[in-house]
UniProtKB/Swiss-Prot annotation:
Protein name as annotated: Putative ankyrin repeat protein R219
InterPro entries: Ankyrin_rpt-contain_sf (IPR036770), SecEffector_AnkRepeat (IPR052050)
Organism encoding this protein: Acanthamoeba polyphaga mimivirus
Key words of the record: ANK repeat, Repeat
Taxonomic superkingdom: Viruses
Spans of repeat ANK: 91-118, 119-148, 200-229, 258-288, 322-351
């Protein structure tokens, strides 16, 4: 973490913080993760993530180093966790917990001495984060009986020193739940201790095989054999996928492998030609010529399966139909060499393989498929590049398909009922709520929630295809196609799609050329305008202003956001459009400490709820200013403020109120 305060390089930047809050909530959708994972994992995923720095820098036309310095500053992180997280998640994260996450020993000691109570979550966080010195400090002030649950957290993340302390000095004993977590670690010392008293069951063994720590798995296998515990032979898929030949040898010597042709799928997922060759040697002995016979692609159609989707996965050789499973597994391996090899063995390619490559493959793999496939792809594949489809390198992949003339997004389409049904089926599949794979979480469409900007207009069906078609053309700057698309006659809903897309994804040069083609004086929807303001896209705002597209009602509706962001450039622009009168409640909501301090110097009239909101900023100067200037209000409601401060974990503020008003 950066110890230089962010204010030395950038003053409080509400635009940056607004963007980061939105992104943080997408990357940490469940607040409980803050209490279930070491903070180092949250930190590397969010505050110290180069992809996030790059995205925000591009959005704000800033430099990556400025964004990185701002987000990795300890002072900012501390404020973000205590102030922003509780606001965004409606969740009270305690001040003591924040300092434990940040491993600030001196601050923790100060807070405890100031009256902050050590609870079970405090101990849990110290165990998760591997802070032995902090745990020792906390244990001095923890009055309740300790629970073996603490062993789960230090075991899972390999903190053997903490495990030793809790089992020896505090006599905590591991149970089966601890065993489940221990085998997820790389600490053989912890696993050895736990397994000496508890027999491994099937779940324990599977957890261990997933982590691929050979020494730990071997230890468990030996003890399982000694205890007579059944070992599932299907566990062999893990060492195959993890390319662990040493573990395969151990399993083979223990006669725990039944070789069969379906294991070849796992070999493909390993991405290793060495493992693929190894499996081929084993399978050929029991199933000669399995490649030539296409055994892996000879699945039978399951009853009740959607025939619309089945058509996308079928290919034909010598009059016989096959299902392109093998190529799909090869694509999921992420290895171009594996994809090349499977193609060389005579396996077919289908539309399904292109969908898999878009979702889980690389640009290079997609280029390979284009080289071998010579049919036009159905237009409904365009939806896998929509704002609701979260994939990596989305626009680069679209470019590959378009420039290889396989996906003709700008050619007229012969509409029919069958195409409509297929298109609707794929849209529903894409929009199904599923767990997003790790890499896809960094798709800007996911992080920035762009799909929220396109909702059906009353009386119209949302034109999904048009939204994605325009967006791709804008981002690839296909101006000839764009000019043609923007000059067509459209209904009102589709015109708004063109307009909103243009201002959300287009450049100012594209706007200057394309907006006049719409032959309208429409203004983008308010959410689009708010996004433009938050990203400080001044040139777009100037275009709207100069073309008189921002009427007074629209401008007035945007003033609260302008006040909250407190950006000098945006303020200057809006001051030319209207008189920006600072509205008290929006100044408070801005959380901009500099603006609020300046505002408080004018001694505005504020009520007790606004005082509470300002206390939540946890800024010493603001707190002291309020206590000095609003003594009548605070004194009148002092009991309420004292209880509220206790509830909100603002004990230092509570102590100041007690000292000043309870003499």
């Amino acid at each position: 973490m950066n110890k230089t305060t962010s204010q030395e390089i950038l003053k409080t930047n509400n635009c940056l913080e607004w963007l980061f809050e939105k992104i943080f909530k997408q990357l940490v959708p469940n607040k409980q993760e803050l209490y279930d994972l070491p903070f180092s994992e949250i930190y590397s995923r969010t505050f110290c993530n180069s992809q996030i720095h790059q995205l925000i820098a591009e959005s704000l036309k800033s430099t990556v180093i400025e964004i990185e310095t701002y987000l990795t500053d300890k002072k900012f992180i501390e404020k973000f966790l205590f102030v922003s997280v509780r606001r965004e998640y409606k969740f009270r994260i305690k001040k003591l917990h924040v300092q434990i996450m940040l491993k600030e020993y001196d601050k923790i000691e100060f807070l405890i001495n100031s009256g902050y109570k050590v609870d079970f979550d405090s101990l849990k966080l110290a165990c998760l984060n591997g802070s032995l010195d902090i745990l020792n400090l906390l244990l001095k002030f923890y009055q309740k009986k300790l629970s073996s649950e603490l062993l789960m957290y230090c075991s899972e993340f390999s903190h053997y020193d903490i495990y030793q302390l809790l089992t020896t000095k505090y006599n905590l004993y591991p149970n089966l739940s601890v065993f489940y977590r221990a085998v997820l670690s790389d600490s053989i010392e912890i696993v050895e201790d736990v397994s000496s008293n508890i027999s491994a069951n099937q779940q324990v063994m599977e957890n261990a095989f997933k982590t691929n720590h050979t020494d730990i798995i071997n230890l468990l296998l030996i003890r399982a054999k000694k205890d007579g515990t059944h070992i599932d032979r299907n566990l062999v898929v893990y060492p195959i996928m993890n390319c662990n030949f040493e573990l395969l040898t151990i399993l083979s010597n223990m006669n725990l492998i039944d070789w069969h042709v379906e294991l070849y799928y796992s070999a493909l997922l390993s991405g290793s030609m060495e493992m693929i060759t190894y499996l081929e040697d084993k399978i050929d002995k029991i199933n000669p010529d399995f490649h030539k016979k296409k055994i892996l692609d000879s699945s039978h159609q399951s009853s009740g399966k959607n025939s619309l989707l089945l058509e996308d996965i079928i290919y034909e050789i010598d009059g016989k139909k096959y299902f392109s499973h093998t190529m799909n597994y090869a694509i999921q391996s992420g290895s171009v060499n594996v994809v090349d090899y499977i193609w060389s063995r005579g396996y077919g390619i289908t539309v399904s393989n292109f969908i898999t490559a878009i979702k889980q493959g690389s640009v290079e793999i997609l280029e390979r498929l284009c080289k071998w496939y010579h049919l036009k792809l159905p237009i409904y594949l365009i939806h896998y590049f929509s704002t609701k489809s979260y994939v990596t390198n989305k626009i680069a992949k679209a470019k590959v398909l378009i420039e290889n003339k396989l996906l003709m997004i700008n050619e007229p389409v012969q509409e029919c009922i069958e195409l409509y049904k297929k298109e609707e089926t794929h849209i529903k599949l894409i929009e199904q709520p599923t767990q997003i794979v790790s890499d896809s979480k960094y798709d800007p469409d996911y992080l920035m929630q762009y799909s929220m900007f396109f909702i059906p207009m009353k009386g119209f069906k949302l034109n999904h295809r048009l939204i994605t078609q325009i967006r791709i053309n804008l981002q690839l700057n296909y101006m000839d196609s764009l000019v043609e698309l923007y000059t067509r006659d459209r209904n009102y809903a589709d015109k708004m799609i063109l307009l909103n897309n243009l201002f959300l994804f287009g450049t100012i040069d594209q706007i200057k050329i394309l907006y006049p083609l719409l032959k309208t004086k429409y203004c983008p929807d308010k959410p689009i305008l708010m996004e433009i303001i938050c990203k400080c896209e001044i040139t777009k705002l100037c275009y709207l202003k100069n073309n008189r597209l921002l009427d007074n009602d629209v401008v007035q509706s945007l003033i609260p956001l302008v006040i909250m962001l407190e950006n000098p450039l945006i303020n200057a622009l809006f001051s030319k459009l209207t008189t920006v009168n600072l509205i008290d409640k929006y100044i408070v909501l801005s959380n901009n400490v500099t603006l609020i301090r300046k505002w408080l110097n004018e001694s505005p009239v504020i009520d007790k709820n606004q005082i509470k909101s300002l206390f939540l900023l946890d800024d010493t100067k603001i707190t002291d200013s309020i206590l000095s200037k609003y003594s009548v209000t605070i004194c009148k409601h002092k009991e309420e403020f004292l209880d509220w401060c206790q509830e909100e974990d603002l004990l230092d503020t509570r102590q100041k109120i007690e000292k000043k008003y309870l003499k």
